[in-house]
């Protein structure tokens, strides 16, 4: 029988556990409508630790989305209309969530299927053997759920004991009242005659002695019941505190760490639904125990009996108040972080959420949340509970928001949608620290009333550190500060301390994560790429990655000190590489057509045994965000040629594929792939109209063509003398032609004696020509101008 069919038959807590597996990360409706397809896929065959399996994971994601879309299309009728919209929405949601990290979808569904199978097995035979899909996370989640299973009967047991104590005490009070009535009867005996008084007095004395003895024994019994109940509550609170520590200090902190790494491009932090279900169970059990303790205290006040129980109850009451206080304050979290590079006068958003809002009825009196930006120093003072002035470091517009309770999802949250940092007040900088190294944080504050104003909590939570910029040119260095902080922040740190030095392998992991996210590619940094980066950073010639494994990288090396002989830092160079790949070269990087991380000498070594016309693309050492072509062409002058680097500006005018297509003497993409086979699908289609075709205004439209003057004869031959092309080279010179005489000729060659360009000596005239092409052109620029 299909697992889903059996899962739908679960009852009680098993059903709740199954429902808690689903949420925004994977809606239960998707599981229901695609149950057969989901269970027929080989989720378990994918190795989550093998990056090469990403292709399989992507295929499964695409298949899931396609199945959802097909299911949506087949919905008809009035009832089917809403379902069609909902399933279509889920298809888009899953695509957006897992497109960059399909492995997380596999991990998610494996976790769901494993737990469904476990719950079904437990329901069928009461056993829970470890299945093939069991992992450390599942085992820990199982342990948490088992602890809840222990807490429920324990809490019910103390409830029963409390009722027993209450009944016993009520009967004791009745008997105590009887004792008082007997004493009153003694006072009335004086009115009787001696014989009758003696008879009645003897009977009353005997009754009083018996009752006093019973009351004395029963008082001891009551005291014993009270002590036993208090001891049971002490044990329950120990178990509750341990469970709360696991959930808040382990699971929630891990979620926050995943959220922090997601800021560096790591996988999404995942849904809060499971965490919320645990926190709500905690809140429910804690509140039940607190009410029991309060009732026990009331019983003691109602009938005081000397002994240790008052002190014990006061202690457990204080303990459970501390526990519930920690739960409420710790579960006030930032679900959606504000941007960590925050530009003034720019709209930004954030979302805060209280994971126990529904269970503790906080939403009955919706609280308001206020956001302020504070300095690192004030953040330190807040965490130390030091009294500080309400001193903010700037002004945020639209910084107040009322929390809303969403009945369907059971979430209590506040969505700040239109905040804007109007101004910022900076602190005095330390030493060489720049403004882009100064960290701030957004402080979210509120006040929650729990249990009908029985308890009132002042709650605060801090965002991840933010770096404030006033101009886009600061974004690069601000991102470096955020990357370093997110990657290397240690648990429980003082805000916002990070190590000044880290091991090179740690930085490699952070760079690779950021690279894949920024370039939006599954092709990350290889071992060879990391060796190249290490050589650049450490100014070393070693080609063995192991030689760098014990070396440390300081923050100054990363983004404060310039690389040797350059006017930029290591990070600025690396960020430039990501920028040009992301904006213009992503498909070529994904195709493996860009080698990228090699220096000039390495490029020559790779090309030396290749046929003429073999070329490779490498990132420029001399220009940030530049990429250059190195190729082999054995001539009388030299064997290796290096073209002046192209940048984002160049590719916004003419694409890399078209530029390579123009250079017919570039034949093979290293190592031996035909150029057209690799790049032809990216060429801009050539219009079918003849060259003499006229535009609406009567002019022939010019076209840009990539030319290297040293190879101009080859280019001219291949162009077939087509006069509608304007030759363009990424160089200080333009190929001489009479009707392009608006600029003076530059006699210097395009390539220097080493086959390289000197970027600082001359002006790139061709780029100015390209700029002019976007403006109204003088008739002298138009070949065959029409009158």
Swiss-Prot record:
Localisation per UniProt entry: Cytoplasm; Nucleus
CDD domains: SH2_STAT5b (cd10420), STAT5_CCD (cd16855), STAT5_DBD (cd16849)
GO cellular component annotations of the record: cytoplasm; cytosol; nucleus; RNA polymerase II transcription regulator complex
Family membership noted in the UniProt record: Belongs to the transcription factor STAT family.
List of residues that carry Phosphotyrosine: 90, 682, 699
GO molecular function: chromatin binding; DNA binding; DNA-binding transcription activator activity, RNA polymerase II-specific; DNA-binding transcription factor activity, RNA polymerase II-specific; protein dimerization activity; protein homodimerization activity; RNA polymerase II cis-regulatory region sequence-specific DNA binding
Residue span, SH2 domain: 589-686
Name used for this protein in its record: Signal transducer and activator of transcription 5B
Organism expressing this protein natively: Sus scrofa (Pig)
Post-translational note: Tyrosine phosphorylated in response to signaling via activated KIT, resulting in translocation to the nucleus. Tyrosine phosphorylated in response to signaling via activated FLT3; wild-type FLT3 results in much weaker phosphorylation than constitutively activated mutant FLT3. Alternatively, can be phosphorylated by JAK2. Phosphorylation at Tyr-699 by PTK6 or HCK leads to an increase of its transcriptional activity.
BP terms from Gene Ontology: cell surface receptor signaling pathway via JAK-STAT; cellular response to epidermal growth factor stimulus; cellular response to growth factor stimulus; cytokine-mediated signaling pathway; defense response; development of secondary female sexual characteristics; development of secondary male sexual characteristics; female pregnancy
Pfam families: SH2 (PF00017), STAT_alpha (PF01017), STAT_bind (PF02864), STAT_int (PF02865), STAT_linker (PF21354)
InterPro entries: p53-like_TF_DNA-bd_sf, SH2, SH2_dom_sf, STAT, STAT5_CCD, STAT5a/5b_DBD, STAT5b_SH2, STAT_linker
Signal peptide: none
Record keywords, A-Z: Activator, Cytoplasm, DNA-binding, Nucleus, Phosphoprotein, SH2 domain, Transcription, Transcription regulation
Role, per record: Carries out a dual function: signal transduction and activation of transcription. Mediates cellular responses to the cytokine KITLG/SCF and other growth factors. Binds to the GAS element and activates PRL-induced transcription. Positively regulates hematopoietic/erythroid differentiation.
Record PTM Phosphoserine, positions in chain: 128
Subunit composition and interactions: Upon activation, forms a homodimer or a heterodimer with a related family member. Binds NR3C1. Interacts with NCOA1. Interacts with NMI. Interacts with SOCS7. Interacts (via SH2 domain) with INSR. Interacts with CPEB3; this inhibits STAT5B-mediated transcriptional activation.
């Amino acid at each position: 029988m299909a697992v889903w069919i059996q899962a739908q038959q679960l009852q009680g807590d098993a059903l709740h556990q199954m429902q808690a597996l689903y949420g925004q990360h994977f809606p239960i409706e998707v599981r229901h409508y695609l149950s057969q397809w989901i269970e027929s896929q080989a989720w378990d065959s994918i190795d989550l630790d093998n990056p090469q399996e990403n292709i399989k994971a992507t295929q499964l994601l695409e298949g899931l989305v396609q199945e959802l879309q097909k299911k949506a299309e087949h919905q008809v009728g009035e009832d089917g209309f809403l379902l069609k919209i909902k399933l279509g929405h889920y298809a888009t949601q899953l695509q957006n969530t897992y497109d960059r990290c399909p492995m997380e979808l596999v991990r998610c569904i494996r976790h769901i299927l494993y737990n469904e199978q476990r719950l079904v097995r437990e329901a069928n035979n009461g056993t829970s053997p470890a299945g093939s899909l069991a992992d450390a996370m599942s085992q820990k989640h199982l342990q948490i759920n088992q602890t809840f299973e222990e807490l429920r009967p324990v809490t019910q047991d103390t409830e029963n004991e409390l009722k027993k104590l209450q009944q016993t005490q009520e009967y004791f009070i009745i008997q105590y009242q009887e004792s008082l009535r007997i004493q009153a009867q003694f006072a009335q005996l004086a009115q009787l005659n001696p014989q009758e008084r003696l008879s009645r007095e003897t009977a009353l004395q005997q009754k009083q002695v018996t009752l006093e003895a019973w009351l004395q024994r029963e008082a001891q019994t009551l005291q014993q019941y009270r002590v036993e109940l208090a001891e049971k509550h002490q044990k329950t609170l120990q178990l509750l505190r341990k469970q709360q520590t696991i959930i808040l200090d382990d699971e929630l902190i891990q979620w926050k760490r995943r959220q922090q790494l997601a800021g560096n491009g790591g996988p999404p932090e995942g849904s809060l639904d499971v965490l919320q279900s645990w926190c709500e169970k905690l809140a429910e059990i804690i509140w039940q125990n607190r009410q029991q303790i309060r009732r026990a205290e009331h019983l003691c006040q109602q009938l005081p009996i000397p002994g240790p129980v008052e002190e014990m109850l006061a202690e457990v009451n204080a303990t459970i108040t501390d526990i519930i206080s920690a739960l409420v304050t710790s579960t006030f979290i930032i679900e959606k972080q504000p941007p960590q590079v925050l530009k003034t006068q720019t709209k930004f958003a954030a979302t805060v959420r209280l994971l126990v809002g529904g269970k503790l009825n906080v939403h009955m009196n919706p609280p308001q949340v206020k956001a302020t930006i504070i300095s690192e120093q004030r953040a330190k003072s807040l965490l130390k509970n030091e009294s500080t002035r309400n001193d903010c470091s700037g002004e945020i517009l639209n910084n107040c928001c009322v929390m809303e309770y969403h009945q369907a999802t059971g979430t209590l949250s506040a969505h700040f949608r239109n905040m804007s940092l109007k101004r910022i007040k900076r602190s005095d900088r330390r030493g060489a620290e720049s403004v882009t190294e100064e960290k701030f944080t957004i402080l979210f504050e509120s006040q929650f009333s729990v249990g009908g104003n029985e308890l009132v909590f002042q709650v605060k939570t801090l965002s991840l550190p933010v770096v404030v910029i006033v101009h886009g040119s600061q974004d690069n260095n601000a991102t470096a500060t955020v990357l370093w902080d997110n990657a290397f922040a240690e648990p429980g740190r003082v805000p916002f301390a990070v190590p000044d030095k880290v091991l090179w392998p740690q930085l490699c992991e952070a760079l690779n994560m950021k690279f894949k996210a920024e370039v939006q590619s599954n092709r990350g940094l290889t071992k060879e790429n990391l060796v190249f980066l290490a050589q650049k950073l450490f100014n070393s010639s070693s080609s063995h990655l192991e030689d760098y494994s014990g070396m440390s990288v300081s923050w100054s090396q990363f983004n404060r000190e310039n690389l040797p002989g350059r006017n930029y830092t290591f990070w600025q160079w690396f960020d430039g590489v990501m920028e040009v790949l992301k904006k213009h070269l992503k498909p070529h990087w994904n195709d493996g057509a860009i080698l990228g991380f090699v220096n000039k000498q390495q490029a020559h070594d790779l090309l030396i045994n290749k046929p003429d016309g073999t070329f490779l693309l490498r990132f420029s050492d001399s220009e940030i965000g530049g990429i250059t072509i190195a190729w082999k062409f054995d001539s009388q002058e030299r064997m290796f040629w290096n073209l002046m680097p192209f940048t984002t500006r160049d590719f916004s005018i003419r694409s890399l594929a078209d530029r390579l297509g123009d250079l017919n003497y570039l034949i093979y993409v290293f190592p031996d792939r035909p150029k057209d086979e690799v790049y032809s699908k990216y060429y801009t289609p050539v219009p079918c109209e003849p060259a003499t075709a006229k535009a609406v205004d009567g002019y022939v439209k010019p076209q840009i063509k990539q030319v290297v003057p040293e190879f101009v004869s080859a280019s001219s031959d291949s162009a077939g003398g087509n006069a509608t092309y304007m030759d363009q080279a990424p160089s200080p010179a333009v190929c001489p032609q009479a009707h392009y005489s608006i600029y003076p000729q530059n006699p210097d060659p395009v390539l220097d004696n080493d086959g390289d360009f000197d970027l600082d000596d001359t002006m790139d005239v061709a780029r100015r020509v390209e700029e002019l092409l976007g403006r109204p052109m003088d008739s002298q620029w138009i070949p065959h101008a029409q009158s």
